[in-house]
Regions:
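Generic, well-ordered alpha-helical scaffold segments in large soluble proteins
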Residues: 40, 61-68, 90, 94, ...
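A short small-residue
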Residues: 41-44, 111-119, 154-156, 224-232, ...
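Conserved helix-loop functional segments at active or binding sites
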Residues: 144-147, 181-184, 188, 217-221, ...
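Conserved hydrophobic residue
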Residues: 50, 74, 263-264, 379, ...
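Acidic, glycine-rich loop-and-beta core segments that form the ion-binding/anion-interacting portion
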Residues: 214-307
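A helix-coil-helix interface module used to build multimeric assemblies
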Residues: 1-201, 206-213, 274-275, 286, ...
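Short amphipathic alpha-helical segments with heptad-repeat character
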Residues: 117, 121-128, 132, 139, ...
Length: 476
């Protein structure tokens, strides 16, 4: 009989047993559940609600169960319905009456909310670590390619030349903001629901602050209804994950393009490529494509929980059983994606010649030629028109701006002098972008220093995340 079966004369229908069980999913939170139960029992003993002997038996019994699960020696029974019932029933089987006292002053409603919050903290921390590792890889690549120039694009058309290091640092800053969002998700989960019981609190003299401190929470949730009924902290994790997936997808798209025959900017290592079953010549960027594809999966998990939550009245509803699978899937998916992305970048080969060659087409110097005229007194809009006419002439002749004779420039505007060649020189164009955040080598060096400082600060934040109940892997 189920632990809640006293009020019932018959068991649940066979067809609903598996349908209603959450154990296949929430068993992955076994460490969080056991840690929460230990803290609850310790508080019950401190408050004189259970004896010290019972608390010791409970703690030892739970430790034994955890060790068995860690070692893969624990059999989960679907009839136990969820991780809470599974562990409590096994605890009672092992230690007897003391196990039946564990649930005093507690409901599965505040218990599962606690497990989930502890789980979100653990998942956010894992993702933060993977985020830091990828940013290290991007930083190393930015240092390595700090003099390599490639075309910058708008609308996927040649725009202006930029340093490859500048391009890579753009993604580093995106992932730095992702770290901040992950920390915000961690903080959103960092309050303890235990003591809220089913929804209204309890008549037992529980010390909620003690339990929260034991579990490493920053504090307690001040409203018992809110404590058991909302999952906005999970949505914060989903949103942070969705933005990470979007940034990874954008970077993956560029890797797919850059590794193509049409671009040839990079060559992916064999370890991060696949072949074709029919075309012997193929070397496909499958893993970049998979990262791009998995972004939709991560977005779907966010939307699923939003839709699940949108119509729920206070307080707990069984719909909330659907809250964990998507979060676990998103975290697992992103951990893989972040790791694969770091591997791809750290092992690729940059084809500097192909990037330099592509800088010689597409009239990348056009803006600087217009600026040349504007700095000599011609209104920029007029300068823009003059250079636009020169570009049109180049298109008709099948040449680039730097191929035009000096006489053609003078015919277009008497303001052109022989030093126009400097405005047509790609390295000089890049070196001129000295504004803060610009692509000039000097500006990028400053930016790199700031990025390294931000990375170091985020590593300090990560190092401060103590007393986190790490995810267990014995239930896989």
């Amino acid at each position: 009989m189920a632990l809640w079966g006293g009020r019932f004369e018959a068991g649940v229908a066979e067809v609903t047993q598996e349908f209603g069980a959450s154990l296949p999913v929430d068993k992955h939170l076994y460490k969080q559940d056991i840690t929460g139960s230990k803290a609850h029992a310790k508080m019950l003993a401190a408050q004189g609600i259970i004896s010290a002997e019972d608390e010791q038996a409970i703690a030892e019994g739970l430790t034994g169960i955890e060790q068995d699960i860690d070692a893969g020696n624990f059999t989960f029974d679907i009839n136990d319905e969820d991780i809470h019932m599974s562990i409590e029933s096994e605890l009672t089987r092992r230690i007897g009456e003391a196990g039946k006292r564990l649930h005093t002053g507690r409901s599965r409603n505040d218990q599962v909310a606690t497990d989930t919050r502890l789980g979100v903290k653990a998942l956010a921390k894992e993702l933060m670590e993977a985020n830091l590792q990828l940013r290290h890889v991007l930083m190393d690549a930015a240092k390595k390619y700090d003099r390599v120039i490639l075309p910058g694009y708008t609308h996927m058309q040649h725009a202006q030349p930029v340093l490859l290091s500048h391009h890579l640092l753009a993604y580093s800053w995106m992932f730095a903001r992702d770290f901040t969002r992950l920390k915000a998700a961690f903080d959103a989960a960092d309050n303890c629901p235990l003591g809220a019981a089913a929804l209204a609190g309890t008549s037992y003299p529980l010390d909620r602050q003690m339990t929260a401190a034991e579990l490493g929470f920053a504090g307690v949730i001040p409203n018992s209804l809110d404590a058991v009924s909302d999952r906005d902290f999970l949505l914060d994790l989903h949103y942070a994950g969705s933005v990470i997936a979007m940034h990874l997808s954008r970077l993956s798209e560029e890797i797919v393009l850059w590794s193509s025959s049409e671009f040839g900017f990079i060559t992916l290592s064999d370890s991060y490529s696949t072949g074709s079953s029919i075309m012997p010549q193929k070397k496909n960027p499958d893993f970049a494509e998979l990262i791009r594809g998995k972004s939709g999966r991560v977005y779907g998990n966010l939307v699923q929980l939003l839709v699940t939550m949108k119509g729920l009245p206070l307080a707990y509803n069984k719909d909330l059983q659907e809250d964990k699978e998507g979060a676990l899937d998103t975290a697992h998916t992103l951990m893989q994606c972040l790791s694969v992305m770091a591997g791809m970048i750290s092992t690729w080969t940059v084809n500097e010649g192909a990037m330099a060659c592509e800088c010689g087409v597409g009239h990348l110097a056009a803006t600087d030629v217009a600026d040349y005229l504007a700095k000599r007194g011609l209104p920029f809009r007029e300068a823009h028109a003059v250079v636009g006419h020169l570009v049109l002439m180049c298109e008709k002749r099948g040449c680039n701006l730097e191929d035009l004779p000096f006489e053609v420039f003078q015919e277009a505007s008497p303001l052109f002098e022989r030093d126009i060649t400097e405005a047509l020189d790609i390295p000089s164009i890049v070196a001129a972008r000295t504004t803060e955040g610009g692509t000039a080598p000097a500006a990028v060096a400053v930016q790199l220093g700031r990025a390294e400082a931000q990375l170091a600060a985020d590593e300090d934040v990560f190092g401060s995340l103590t007393k986190v109940v790490e995810m267990g892997h014995g239930a896989n």
